[in-house]
């Protein structure tokens, strides 16, 4: 059963698309989202479009979702299998200076935090030891070539794996393409699993009559 919290978040992201990430969902399973994260500008990851999968547990939002990169990544806090090491996705038993998952978190803020992490690694909590070592050398200007070179490889590969449609999306992200839903709007599920909001014509006619008065 899909929680009302998750459904509400999904609808909100469809109504208010982000320039920083793109989501797509299989209509048969709303608990698994495919995500493309845009590499932050003015960073080594700029230009990359990195694919990831989010899996929501049955008790969401009281338990954190799991995010796994499916694109190849070179980052101190991303394991070789794509799993992510970030404090806000840790459960109650995590000991990350109190920065653990909270039911008040929204998935859009989580995704923005993940994007921010790309440019601000935590080498003291490495998931990829080799990447962490390389990043430290880059950070302390002992080796300014190796880390950027590996990151740029992943940027290029991510673009090679993206469709032309995905690349075009980030060039022309629609902003506020639909009005904020109100009682006058109804949900209509599309074949691809997304939702659109349709306006009740009868309500529109009533509004026009009131205006005429």
From Swiss-Prot:
InterPro entries: Ub_conjugating_enzyme, UBQ-conjugat_E2_core, UBQ-conjugating_AS, UBQ-conjugating_enzyme/RWD
Enzyme Commission numbers on file: 2.3.2.23
Keywords (A to Z) from UniProt: ATP-binding, Early protein, Host cytoplasm, Host nucleus, Late protein, Nucleotide-binding, Transferase, Ubl conjugation pathway, Virion
Parts of the chain that traverse the membrane: none
Coiled coil feature spans: none
Pathway per the UniProt entry: Protein modification; protein ubiquitination
Compartments where found: Host cytoplasm; Host nucleus; Virion
Catalytic activity: S-ubiquitinyl-[E1 ubiquitin-activating enzyme]-L-cysteine + [E2 ubiquitin-conjugating enzyme]-L-cysteine = [E1 ubiquitin-activating enzyme]-L-cysteine + S-ubiquitinyl-[E2 ubiquitin-conjugating enzyme]-L-cysteine
Domain UBC core residues, every copy: 1-160
Active site, per annotation: 85
A Pfam family this chain is assigned to: UQ_con
SMART domains: UBCc (SM00212)
Expression induction or repression: Expressed in the early phase of the viral replicative cycle.
Similarity annotation: Belongs to the ubiquitin-conjugating enzyme family.
Function summary: Accepts ubiquitin from the E1 complex and catalyzes its covalent attachment to other proteins. Performs the second step in the ubiquitination reaction that targets specifically a protein for degradation via the proteasome. By controlling the ubiquitination status of specific host proteins, the virus may target them to degradation and thereby optimize the viral replication. May be implicated in the shutoff of protein synthesis through its interactions with components of the host translation machinery.
Protein name (database record): Ubiquitin-conjugating enzyme E2
Species the sequence originates in: African swine fever virus (isolate Tick/Malawi/Lil 20-1/1983)
Top-level taxonomy: Viruses, Varidnaviria, Bamfordvirae, Nucleocytoviricota, Pokkesviricetes
């Amino acid at each position: 059963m899909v929680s009302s919290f998750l459904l509400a978040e999904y609808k909100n992201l469809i109504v208010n698309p982000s320039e920083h990430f793109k989501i797509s969902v299989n209509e048969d399973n709303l608990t698994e989202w495919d995500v493309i994260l845009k590499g932050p500008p003015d960073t080594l990851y700029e230009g990359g479009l990195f694919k990831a999968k989010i899996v929501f547990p049955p008790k969401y939002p009281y338990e954190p979702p799991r995010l796994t990169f499916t694109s190849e990544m070179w980052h101190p806090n991303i394991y070789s299998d794509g799993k992510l090491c970030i404090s806000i996705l840790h459960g109650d038993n995590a000991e990350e200076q109190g920065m653990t998952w909270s039911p008040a978190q929204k998935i859009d803020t989580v995704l923005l935090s993940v994007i921010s992490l790309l440019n601000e690694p935590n080498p003291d909590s490495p998931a990829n030891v080799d990447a962490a070592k390389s990043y430290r050398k880059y950070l302390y200007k002992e080796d300014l070539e190796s880390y950027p070179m590996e990151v740029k490889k992943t940027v290029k590969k991510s673009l090679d794996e993206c469709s032309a449609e995905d690349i075009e999306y980030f060039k022309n992200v629609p902003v506020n393409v639909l009005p904020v839903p109100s009682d006058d709007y109804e949900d209509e599920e599309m074949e691809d699993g997304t939702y659109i909001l349709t306006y009740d014509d009868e309500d529109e006619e009533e509004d026009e009559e009131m205006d005429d008065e």
